[in-house]
Amino acid sequence: MNNRALLLTDGFLATPNAKTAHGLIRGSERYTVVGVLDKPTAGQDAGVVLDGHNRGIPIVASVSEALSQLAPLQYAIVAIATNGGVLPASMLNDIKECIEHGLSIVNGLHEFLNDKPDIVTLAQQYGVELIDVRRPKPRNELHFWTGEVNQITAPI
């Protein structure tokens, strides 16, 4: 798998607020998680912090440390779940630094990175993607009820 990813947890790794990270640490078919950026738990293994099982996923204290130890990286994933889905302002510098080093950002929060002009401009400048997974598709791409399911025959 080539989708090598760094999880950004902003100090929440050892809390329930990092449930996105917890799931990805346990396993992912889409991404190869190669590290976690979490200053309070830096130097430990992410699996050990999560549930006591070593998974060979190092925790680092900075983006520069991640880049020097874990390269190549393709993605940084905002791997926390906050009250209201708000992006903590404290994460913005790490996100910007990741973008400046060519990492696309995957964001599962309800606050969209694509709504932040400075982040969008930076991503365009460095040729990376901002993937807001919770952003709904445009209305013209949505599928509406057609009744087609009623044509399916199935044994009872």
Role assignments for model-derived ranges:
Residues M1-T32:
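N-terminal phosphate-binding or glycine-rich loops at protein starts, especially the Walker A/P-loop
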Residues T15-P16, T41-G47, F112-D115:
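Short, charged/polar "capping" segments at the starts of alpha-helices
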Residues V33, K39-P58:
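N-terminal beta-loop-helix "entrance" segment that forms/cooperates
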Residues L50-Q69, V86-L92:
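Glycine-rich, highly charged phosphate/nucleotide-binding loops
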Residues P72-A89:
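Rossmann-like NAD(P)-binding element
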Residues V86, L109-I131:
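Rossmann-fold NAD(P)-binding glycine/threonine-rich loop
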Residues E97-N114:
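ADP-ribose/adenylate-binding Rossmann-like module
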Residues N140-I156:
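Walker A (P-loop) phosphate-binding motif
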